[in-house]
C-alpha cells in the first residue's frame, strides 16, 4: 500500500521524485518538493528514523563545532521561537531532537520508508524515468532522483591482519550501537581526526586505560563550548535575519565575522595577541578564519598559526617525548579541529599515545593490537575513528546508472567530478545534495542553498514542460576546473587530508570542494538560474512507452 496520498503528476511514474536520505538534505528536499511544489515524493533511508549522520554517529562526545544558532535551517522561524540551546555547540542528542521536531512540524515521515536501503538507480531513456531499486526488493519509478547520501557517511574501516581473531569488541564511530559502556574498559582508539578528538576526550576520563593510535599529529585548539544563557539566546533570535544574511555571504558559514586582516603584515606581537584571544574563545574554524584572512593561503601566516599551536602543545603536555609525538610536522591546512582539553588528555596516567606512523600496527591479536616493533597493547574494545570515504564514497558504492547505462563508478574512476556539486553529465534529472565540488563550509547553510536551487530548477523544468535536464560536458568541466584553480590558490592541497581523499588507500587524490566560500558559491549558482539555465541540456522529446 502506498504511503502517499498525493497524485503523481508525471505520467507513468510511481512518484514525481525519489529522495534518498533523511538527514538535513533529504528532509529539506522532501519539504520543498512535496509541501511547497505539490509533487508526489517518496523518501528512503537505511536508518530507522530521521537524522542522517546524526542518527548513526552516537559515539561519546559527538557534537557539532558550529555555533548552535546556525547549525539548523534558516527558514524555520516557528521552531526558532521555541528553540533553546544550552551551549555554544549542539550535542548529537540535541541535533537529533531538533531534526525530529522538524520532521514532526513539517509532517515529513509520511513520505519516507525507513530501514530501507537504496541499492541502485537506473535511468530508463525510453520512459525518461529513474528505476529505483531497494534492498527490500521494491522497485519504484520517478522522474527526478535527489540524493542526500551524506558528505561524511560512507564509513572507512581499515583492513588489518588478524582482526577477526580479536576477542574484544570492535566499533566504528560512524555506526555506533546503543548501550555501549566504555567505563572501566581498556579502550583503543584508532584515528585522531575531528571524530577521534571528540571520542578521545570523552573516553579518557571513564576508561580503565585508553590507548590512542595516532598516524597523524593534529593541530587542535580548545572547543570553547560555553553555556548560553537566556539573554544571549534572546539576542541571537532577535538578530536572526542579520546573522543569516552574514552567514549566506560569508566564506565558511560558521556564524562569526571572518577576519579581513592578513597575518603576513601583522607584527609578531599582534599575531600573538590575536591568536591567544582566539585560543581562549575556542573554535577550530574561528581560529583559522576568524583571526586572520590569510592563514589558509599564505605560508608566512600559516607558519605563524602553526607555531602558536605548537607552542601550546609544548606548554600543556608535561612529558616532552609525548609532546613531540603530538606536534604536527605538516602545514596547518586540514579541516580545523577543536576539542575539550585534548592535549591535557595525554597528561593522564591512564592514557598511552602510540605513534603508528613511526611504529605501524602490524596485526590484531586475540587480546589486542601488536605494533611492528613487537609491542602489544591489550584491549577490551577497539574504536575505529577512521572517518569516511568522503563526498563520493556512497555514490560509487551504489549501482547508479545514467544515460546509455554509464555508471557513476566509471564516470568518476579518475576522481569525482560534478557540476555545481549537484549534477553530473549523462545523469538526467539527477540532483545531488553535497555532491563533489560543492562548497567547503558549515553544512546546513550549504544544504539549504543547494536544495533551494534544486527545487527551483525542478520547478522551472516542470513549468517549461522539460522531460529531462543535465549539464553539458563543457559546463561540468569548466566548473571542475574552477574548483581546482581555487584549491590551488590555498595551502590545503599541500596537506594529506580526507578533503582530497588521502585517507582512503588506493583512492586518487582529487579536488572535491569549491573553496571560494558560500557567498561566492551562491552567486555562481544564482547566475546559472538568471542566465536561463544555458549550461544545462533540456530535452522535451523523451519517448513514452
UniProtKB/Swiss-Prot annotation:
Site (Transition state stabilizer): 335
Biotechnology (record note): This enzyme offers a promising route for the synthesis of chiral ene-lactones, when expressed in an engineered strain deprived of enone reductase activity.
Keywords recorded for this protein, A-Z: FAD, Flavoprotein, Monooxygenase, NADP, Oxidoreductase
TM helices/strands, residue ranges: none
Record-listed FAD binding positions: 24, 45, 54, 65, 71, 118
InterPro entries given in the database record: FAD-binding_Monooxygenases (IPR050775), FAD/NAD-bd_sf (IPR036188), Flavin_mOase-like (IPR020946)
GO molecular function: flavin adenine dinucleotide binding; N,N-dimethylaniline monooxygenase activity; NADP binding
Origin superkingdom: Bacteria
Cofactor(s) the protein requires to work: FAD
Gene3D superfamilies for this protein: FAD/NAD(P)-binding domain
EC number, UniProt record: 1.14.13.-
Entries under PANTHER family matching the protein: DUAL-FUNCTIONAL MONOOXYGENASE_METHYLTRANSFERASE PSOF, L-ORNITHINE N(5)-MONOOXYGENASE-RELATED
Primary role: Catalyzes a Baeyer-Villiger oxidation reaction, i.e. the insertion of an oxygen atom into a carbon-carbon bond adjacent to a carbonyl, which converts ketones to esters or lactones using NADPH as an electron donor. Besides cycloalkanones, can use cyclic alpha,beta-unsaturated ketones as substrates, leading to conjugated ene-lactones. Can also act on methylated cycloalkanones and methylated cycloalkenones with high enantioselectivity in some cases.
Similarity comment text for this entry: Belongs to the FAD-binding monooxygenase family.
Note in the entry: Displays a different regioselectivity from P.lavamentivorans BVMO.
Protein's recorded name: Baeyer-Villiger monooxygenase
Organism this protein belongs to: Pseudooceanicola batsensis (strain ATCC BAA-863 / DSM 15984 / KCTC 12145 / HTCC2597) (Oceanicola batsensis)
Taxonomic classification: Bacteria, Pseudomonadati, Pseudomonadota, Alphaproteobacteria, Rhodobacterales
Amino acid at each position: 500500500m502506498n504511503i502517499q496520498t498525493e497524485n503523481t503528476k508525471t505520467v507513468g511514474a510511481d512518484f514525481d521524485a525519489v529522495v534518498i536520505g533523511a538527514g538535513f538534505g533529504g528532509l529539506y528536499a522532501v519539504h520543498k518538493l512535496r509541501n511547497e511544489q505539490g509533487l508526489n515524493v517518496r523518501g528512503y533511508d537505511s536508518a530507522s528514523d530521521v537524522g542522517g549522520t546524526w542518527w548513526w554517529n552516537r559515539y561519546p562526545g559527538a557534537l557539532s563545532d558550529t555555533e548552535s544558532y546556525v547549525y539548523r535551517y534558516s527558514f524555520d522561524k516557528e521552531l526558532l521561537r521555541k528553540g533553546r540551546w544550552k551551549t555554544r555547540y549542539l550535542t548529537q542528542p540535541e541535533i537529533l531532537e531538533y531534526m525530529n521536531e522538524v520532521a514532526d512540524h513539517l509532517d515529513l515521515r509520511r513520505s519516507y520508508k525507513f530501514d530501507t536501503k537504496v541499492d541502485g538507480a537506473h535511468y530508463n531513456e525510453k520512459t525518461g524515468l529513474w528505476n529505483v531499486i531497494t534492498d527490500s526488493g521494491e522497485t519504484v519509478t520517478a522522474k527526478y532522483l535527489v540524493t542526500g547520501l551524506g558528505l561524511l557517511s560512507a564509513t572507512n574501516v581499515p583492513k588489518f591482519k588478524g582482526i577477526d581473531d580479536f576477542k574484544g569488541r570492535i566499533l566504528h564511530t560512524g555506526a555506533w550501537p546503543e548501550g555501549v559502556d566504555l567505563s572501566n574498559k581498556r579502550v583503543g582508539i584508532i584515528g585522531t581526526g575531528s571524530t577521534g578528538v571528540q571520542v578521545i576526550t570523552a573516553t579518557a576520563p571513564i576508561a580503565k586505560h585508553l590507548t590512542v593510535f595516532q598516524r597523524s599529529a593534529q593541530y587542535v585548539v580548545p572547543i570553547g563550548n560555553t553555556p548560553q544563557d537566556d539573554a544571549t539566546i534572546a539576542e541571537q533570535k532577535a538578530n536572526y535575519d542579520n546573522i543569516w544574511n552574514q552567514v549566506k555571504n560569508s566564506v565558511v558559514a560558521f556564524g562569526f565575522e571572518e577576519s579581513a586582516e592578513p597575518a603576513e603584515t601583522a607584527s609578531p606581537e599582534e599575531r600573538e595577541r590575536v591568536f591567544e584571544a582566539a585560543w581562549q574563545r575556542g573554535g577550530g574554524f574561528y581560529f583559522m578564519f576568524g583571526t586572520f584572512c590569510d592563514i589558509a593561503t599564505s605560508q608566512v601566516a600559516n607558519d605563524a598559526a602553526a607555531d602558536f599551536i605548537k607552542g601550546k602543545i609544548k606548554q600543556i603536555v608535561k612529558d616532552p617525548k609525548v609532546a613531540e609525538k603530538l606536534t604536527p610536522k605538516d602545514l596547518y591546512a586540514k579541516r580545523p579541529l577543536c576539542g575539550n582539553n585534548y592535549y591535557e588528555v595525554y597528561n593522564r596516567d591512564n592514557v598511552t599515545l602510540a605513534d603508528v606512523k613511526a611504529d605501524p600496527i602490524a596485526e590484531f591479536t586475540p587480546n589486542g593490537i601488536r605494533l611492528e616493533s613487537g609491542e602489544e597493547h591489550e584491549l577490551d574494545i577497539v574504536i575505529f575513528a577512521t572517518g569516511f570515504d568522503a563526498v563520493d564514497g556512497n555514490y560509487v558504492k551504489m549501482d547508479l546508472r545514467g544515460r546509455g547505462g554509464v555508471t557513476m563508478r566509471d564516470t568518476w574512476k579518475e576522481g569525482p567530478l560534478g557540476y555545481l556539486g549537484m549534477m553530473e553529465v549523462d545523469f538526467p534529472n539527477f540532483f545531488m545534495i553535497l555532491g563533489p565540488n560543492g562548497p567547503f563550509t558549515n553544512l546546513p547553510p550549504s544544504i539549504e542553498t543547494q536544495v533551494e536551487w534544486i527545487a527551483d530548477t525542478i520547478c522551472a523544468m516542470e513549468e517549461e514542460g522539460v522531460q529531462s535536464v543535465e549539464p553539458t560536458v563543457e559546463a561540468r568541466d569548466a566548473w571542475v576546473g574552477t574548483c581546482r584553480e581555487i584549491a590551488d590558490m590555498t595551502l590545503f592541497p599541500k596537506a594529506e587530508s580526507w578533503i582530497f581523499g588521502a585517507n582512503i588507500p588506493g583512492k586518487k587524490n582529487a579536488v572535491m570542494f569549491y573553496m571560494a566560500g558560500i557567498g561566492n558559491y551562491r552567486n555562481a549558482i544564482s547566475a546559472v538560474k538568471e542566465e536561463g539555465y544555458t549550461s544545462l541540456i533540456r530535452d522535451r522529446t523523451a519517448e513514452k512507452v
